[in-house]
């Protein structure tokens, strides 16, 4: 059974039973047993033993392996895209773009490493000042289920490039994607022990996070789990912790001329990936009055016709399923709780089939809800809040513990500049979907949304630490000795 990849060999798990399911059909996609604590220990030890040789390779030698990995991804792109769709439920057109992002991450990471963490030097009067960067050592990477290939790849690629060795624990909901990805690394010639895969759920994750042999942990996932990791690593300045978490993201709509363009951008912001992107719009802030009424009516009208279906359905749907039946039922329950608090249903989010994790888009007006929960409802549920003036909209947009993404739809550049200056988020977009971000730019947020800028251009910053040196080829006395010293 090919479950875990440790020290260059595949082995069966010794922990709890695991299986991943197709979210729509509930067919078993993958099954095995998770890694127990002893296997996690073995993976960390294998990474530690592989570290000296990998770190001492030239940068060009490591780049060569990364570029071969990118070629393997291209060769297996169809199989990877199919697997991503099958395990996550996202349509094939969307899972194919994820594989493309994985390929592109290699070149971006190489560029980022050279520009942000390469070697720099400059002359001084009697020496040379040199800045170099060194890898941390052994790092754990925890991956999410919503982008099971792209997001962990955004940690793993720059970590390996910098000279680290990795122990990778993917989401227990998407183990097959992780297995296929690791096979691409093996085919690229990555030495044994440099990348180790441990599958598993909570038991495996707890063992890996607590292992004293790791020098850092790179995490993408929920704020709840990220906060627990932050508490666990408190008082451990010797460990590097990079967290990319969620958001209760606001999208503010100003009066724009093209109503349908606004509606389309809202749909792309709120409902792409069935609302399972950390940057998806969760709160839609709409001005009070006739124009705002017309926008909401048109949005509801268009959303009624959005197609929802299985990942391989033809013609292709816009939305696939959410990750699991459990997730679907939790979202329907969250909608009911908001209604009980006084919200108004504009478009009901429904689960058409009780045995499938398919949900239709939901739109709910929560303006009248006094105690709106500051939560990330990770699915196709959009909350509408009506505002009286632009300053009130900005105040409401910032009324969250999170700070990942925020956006403005407006025909006024002055409005955008005003919004940008006051917006509390790591990503601020103007007249573009909230889920859009340039891979060549930093990605991440502030507050409860995380600390470092994970899985993108600034990932190089936390994958290596700077070493400043003063250097001269020969030791010599200075021209003038300091007072009080006689030779």
From Swiss-Prot:
So which domain of life are we looking at?
Bacteria
Reaction catalyzed: N-succinyl-L-glutamate 5-semialdehyde + NAD(+) + H2O = N-succinyl-L-glutamate + NADH + 2 H(+)
Q: Which Gene3D superfamilies match?
A: Aldehyde Dehydrogenase, Chain A, domain 1, Aldehyde Dehydrogenase, Chain A, domain 2
Per the UniProt record, which EC number(s) apply here?
1.2.1.71
Q: Which PROSITE patterns match?
A: ALDEHYDE_DEHYDR_CYS (PS00070), ALDEHYDE_DEHYDR_GLU (PS00687)
Q: Top enzyme class of this protein?
A: oxidoreductase
**Matching InterPro entries, A to Z?**
Ald_DH/histidinol_DH, Ald_DH_C, Ald_DH_CS_CYS, Ald_DH_CS_GLU, Ald_DH_N, Aldehyde_DH_dom, SuccinylGlu_semiald_DH_AstD
Q: Which cysteines are joined by disulfide bonds?
A: none
- Cited NCBIfam families: arg_catab_astD, PRK09457.1
Annotated function: Catalyzes the NAD-dependent reduction of succinylglutamate semialdehyde into succinylglutamate.
Protein name as annotated: N-succinylglutamate 5-semialdehyde dehydrogenase
């Amino acid at each position: 059974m090919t479950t875990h990849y440790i020290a260059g060999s595949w082995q069966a798990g010794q922990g709890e039973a695991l299986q991943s399911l197709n979210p729509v059909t509930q067919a078993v996609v993958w099954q095995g047993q998770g890694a127990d604590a002893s296997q996690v220990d073995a993976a960390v030890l294998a990474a530690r033993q592989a570290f000296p040789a990998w770190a001492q390779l030239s940068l060009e030698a490591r780049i060569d392996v990364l570029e071969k990995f990118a070629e393997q991804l291209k060769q297996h792109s169809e199989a990877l895209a199919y697997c991503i769709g099958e395990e996550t439920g996202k349509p094939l057109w969307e899972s194919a773009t994820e594989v493309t992002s994985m390929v592109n991450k290699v070149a971006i990471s190489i560029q980022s490493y050279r520009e942000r963490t390469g070697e720099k030097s400059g002359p001084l009067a009697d020496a040379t000042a040199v800045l170099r960067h060194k890898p941390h050592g052994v790092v754990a990477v925890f991956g999410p289920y919503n982008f099971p290939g792209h997001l962990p790849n955004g940690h793993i690629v720059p970590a390996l490039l910098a000279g680290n060795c990795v122990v990778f624990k993917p989401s227990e909901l998407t183990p097959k994607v992780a297995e296929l990805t690791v096979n691409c690394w093996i085919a690229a010639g990555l030495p044994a022990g440099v990348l180790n895969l441990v599958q598993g759920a909570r038991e495996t994750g707890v063992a890996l996070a607590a292992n004293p042999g790791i020098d850092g942990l790179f995490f993408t996932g929920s704020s709840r789990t990220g906060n627990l990791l932050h508490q666990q690593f408190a008082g451990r300045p010797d460990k590097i912790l990079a967290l990319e978490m969620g958001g209760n993201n606001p999208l503010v709509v100003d009066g724009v001329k093209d109503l349908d363009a606004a509606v389309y951008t809202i749909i792309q912001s709120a409902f792409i990936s069935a609302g399972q992107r950390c940057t998806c719009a969760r709160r839609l802030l709409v001005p009070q009055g006739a124009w705002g009424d017309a926008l909401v009516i048109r949005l509801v009208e268009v959303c009624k016709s959005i197609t929802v279906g299985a990942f391989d359905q033809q013609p292709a749907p816009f939305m696939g399923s959410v990750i699991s039946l459990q997730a679907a039922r939790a979202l329907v329950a969250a909608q009911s709780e908001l209604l009980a608090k006084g919200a108004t249903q504009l478009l009901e989010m429904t689960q058409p089939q009780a045995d499938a994790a398919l949900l239709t888009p939901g739109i709910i007006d929560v303006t009248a809800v006094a105690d709106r929960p500051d939560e990330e409802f990770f699915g196709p549920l959009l909350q509408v809040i009506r505002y009286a003036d632009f300053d009130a909209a900005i105040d409401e947009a910032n009324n969250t513990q999170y700070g990942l993404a925020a956006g403005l739809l407006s025909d006024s550049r002055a409005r955008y500049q005003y919004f940008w200056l006051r917006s509390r988020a790591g990503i601020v977009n103007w007249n573009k979907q909230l889920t859009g971000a340039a891979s060549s730019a930093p990605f991440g947020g502030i507050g409860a949304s995380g600390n470092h800028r994970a899985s993108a251009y600034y990932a190089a910053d936390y994958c290596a630490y700077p070493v400043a040196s003063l250097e001269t080829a020969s030791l010599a006395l200075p021209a003038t000795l300091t007072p009080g010293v006689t030779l």
